[in-house]
C-alpha cells in the first residue's frame, strides 16, 4: 500500500492548549456567575412568612390588646345607677409628663429619641382608644403635662405645647380641661417660676377655676401656687379664688381636683390594695417639689370647698384615703384618690386613668343638718392601660427570632433544607401530575432524593454567605419597618 499521497493533518499543540484554556475560562465564568447569583439570592418566600408573623404580632399588641383593655373598663361593667339613668362620664388623666431632653440627661441622644417615640406613641394610642371606645363626656388632666416645662424658654415651650396637643388632641363636642399645673410645669411653692406660671395660664387657662358638669361642681385648685409664702404675685390668684368660692353659693356636689395630694398621716391613712408600692405614702420635699400640701393649707381647702370627693396626681401611684374636716360643728369626711400616672415611664408597671361616673338628678334632695346628700352621686373606677413593657418584650423576642431564623437559613443551609425546606415543600407544593412531583421509588438512593430537594423553590443555597445573610436581613428589616411606622403614626 502506498501512503505517500495521503494527506496528514497535524494538530497543533498550541491551538489545543488555547482551546482548553478558553473552555476552562468559559466554565469558570459560568461557575462564578452562578455563584454570584447564589450569593445575591433573596428568599422572598421566607421573608414574606416572617413579615406576616410580624404583622400579626404588632397588630395584636397595638390593637387587640388595647381594645381588650378598653372593654374591661366599659362603663356598663361597673356603673350601678338606676335603670335608664343618664350619667355624666369623666376621664381623669394624671402626670402624662411627656418626655423631653430634661427627662434623661445622661443617656445618648439616639436612645432618648427612640424612647420618646415609644412613650409618645403609648400616650397617643391610649388617648385615641379611650376617646373612641369609652367616649367620656369630660376629660380632666391633673397636672405635670410636661417634664421640664418650668425650665424651657418660650421657643422650646411652644414647640412642646404643640407636640402635647398633637398627642392629646381635643375631641369635638367633648370637654377637655388641661389648665391644672404640676410642679414639672411651673415649680412648687416658694420656688414657683413666675414666668412659667404666667405662660402656662396664658395657653391653658386660669390655673384655679370651677365649672359645672353632670350636675356637679368641679373645683380646680392650683395648690402649688397657693403654697408659695414668699411671692404674693404667685399665691394671690389661688388665694382669692379660694376665698371667693367659700363665700359663694354652690348647691351642687363639689369635686376637688389638685395636682399635689393633701396632707395625711401615712401610718394611719394607708393607701389600699390597688397601690403598687408596698411602702407608706412618702412625705418628702425638695427642690421644686413636695409630696403633700401642708397640713394647715389642706384643712383650709377642705373646709372652704367641702368636697364630696377629691382627686390628685403627682405621686404616680394609686392611693385612696379618707380626710376629715370640721363643718358646722360636726365632722365631715371626703375621699381622696391619688390617680395613677397614665405614662409608661413614671416608675410604675401598670399605667392607668381614673374613670368617674356622675348621676345627680334634679330631684335629689340634701340633708340640711349634715350638709350631705341623700344618696351617693358619684362612682369611680380604676382603668388600667395596656401593659407597655410586655409589648416591648414581645417585639424584642420577635427580633431575636427573626435574626436567628435568617442566620439558620444562611449559616446552616443543609440542615435548613433537610428540616424547614422539606416541610415547606411538602405542605405548599401541589402535585400537578408530573412524575417529578410523585413520590420517589424506594430503590432510588437518598442522595438522589436530596438532589431533587435542591431544585425545590423552598430550598436555599447550600453555601454559607455572610453577604447574602446581610442582604436578606436588611430586606426583612426594611419590610417590617412600615408596619411599625403605620401603627406608630397613622393608627
UniProtKB/Swiss-Prot annotation:
EC number: 3.1.-.-
Topology feature Cytoplasmic, residues: 1-39, 413-465
Membrane-crossing segments per the record: 40-60, 392-412, 466-486
Annotated localization: Membrane
Skewed-composition ranges (Basic residues): 24-33
Required co-factors: a divalent metal cation
Record GO terms (molecular function): hydrolase activity; metal ion binding
Membrane topology: Multi-pass membrane protein
Residues binding a divalent metal cation 2: 144, 183
Sites where the protein binds a divalent metal cation 1: 95, 144, 323
Taxonomy, superkingdom: Eukaryota
Region ranges (Disordered): 1-33
Record's GO cellular component terms: endoplasmic reticulum; membrane
Family: Belongs to the metallophosphoesterase superfamily. MPPE1 family.
The protein's name: Cell division control protein 1
Annotated organism of origin: Saccharomyces cerevisiae (strain ATCC 204508 / S288c)
Amino acid at each position: 500500500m502506498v501512503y505517500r499521497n495521503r494527506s496528514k493533518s497535524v494538530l497543533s499543540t498550541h491551538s489545543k492548549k488555547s482551546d482548553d484554556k478558553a473552555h476552562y475560562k468559559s466554565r469558570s465564568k459560568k461557575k462564578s456567575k452562578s455563584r454570584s447569583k447564589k450569593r445575591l439570592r433573596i428568599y422572598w418566600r421566607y421573608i414574606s412568612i416572617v413579615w406576616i408573623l410580624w404583622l400579626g404580632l404588632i397588630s395584636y399588641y397595638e390593637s387587640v390588646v388595647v381594645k381588650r383593655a378598653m372593654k374591661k373598663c366599659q362603663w356598663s361593667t361597673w356603673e350601678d345607677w338606676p335603670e335608664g339613668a343618664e350619667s355624666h362620664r369623666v376621664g381623669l388623666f394624671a402626670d402624662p409628663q411627656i418626655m423631653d431632653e430634661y427627662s434623661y440627661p445622661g443617656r445618648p441622644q439616639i436612645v432618648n429619641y427612640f424612647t420618646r417615640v415609644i412613650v409618645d406613641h403609648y400616650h397617643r394610642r391610649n388617648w385615641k382608644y379611650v376617646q373612641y371606645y369609652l367616649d367620656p363626656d369630660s376629660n380632666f388632666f391633673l397636672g405635670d403635662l410636661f417634664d421640664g416645662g418650668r425650665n424651657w424658654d418660650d421657643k422650646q415651650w411652644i414647640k412642646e405645647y404643640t407636640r402635647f396637643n398633637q398627642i392629646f388632641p381635643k375631641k369635638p363636642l367633648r370637654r377637655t380641661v388641661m389648665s391644672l399645673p404640676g410642679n414639672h410645669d411651673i415649680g412648687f411653692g416658694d420656688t414657683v417660676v413666675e414666668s412659667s406660671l404666667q405662660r402656662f395660664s396664658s395657653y391653658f387657662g386660669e390655673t384655679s377655676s370651677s365649672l359645672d358638669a353632670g350636675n356637679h361642681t368641679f373645683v380646680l385648685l392650683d395648690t402649688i401656687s397657693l403654697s408659695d409664702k414668699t411671692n404674693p404675685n404667685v399665691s394671690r390668684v389661688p388665694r382669692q379664688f379660694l376665698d371667693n368660692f367659700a363665700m359663694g353659693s354652690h348647691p351642687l356636689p363639689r369635686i376637688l381636683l389638685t395636682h399635689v395630694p393633701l396632707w395625711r398621716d401615712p401610718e394611719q391613712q394607708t393607701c389600699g390594695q390597688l397601690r403598687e408600692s408596698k411602702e407608706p405614702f412618702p412625705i418628702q420635699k425638695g427642690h421644686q417639689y413636695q409630696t403633700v400640701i401642708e397640713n394647715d393649707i389642706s384643712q383650709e381647702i377642705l373646709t372652704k370647698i367641702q368636697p364630696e370627693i377629691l382627686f390628685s396626681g403627682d405621686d404616680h401611684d394609686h392611693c385612696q384615703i379618707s380626710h376629715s374636716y370640721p363643718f358646722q360643728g360636726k365632722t365631715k369626711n371626703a375621699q381622696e384618690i391619688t390617680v395613677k400616672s397614665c405614662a409608661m415611664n413614671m416608675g410604675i408597671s401598670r399605667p392607668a386613668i381614673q374613670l368617674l361616673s356622675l348621676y345627680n338628678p334634679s330631684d335629689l334632695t340634701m340633708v340640711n343638718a349634715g350638709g350631705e346628700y341623700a344618696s351617693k352621686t358619684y362612682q369611680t373606677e380604676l382603668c388600667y392601660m395596656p401593659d407597655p413593657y410586655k409589648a416591648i418584650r414581645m417585639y424584642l423576642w420577635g427580633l431575636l427570632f427573626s435574626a436567628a431564623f435568617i442566620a439558620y437559613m444562611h449559616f446552616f443551609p443543609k440542615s435548613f433544607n433537610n428540616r424547614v425546606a422539606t416541610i415547606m415543600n411538602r405542605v405548599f407544593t401541589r402535585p400537578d401530575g408530573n412524575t417529578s412531583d410523585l413520590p420517589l421509588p424506594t430503590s432510588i438512593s437518598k442522595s438522589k432524593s436530596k438532589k431533587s430537594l435542591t431544585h425545590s423553590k423552598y430550598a436555599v443555597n447550600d453555601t454559607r454567605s455572610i453577604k447574602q445573610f446581610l442582604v436578606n436581613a436588611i430586606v426583612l428589616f426594611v419590610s417590617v419597618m412600615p408596619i411599625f411606622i403605620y401603627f406608630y403614626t397613622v393608627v
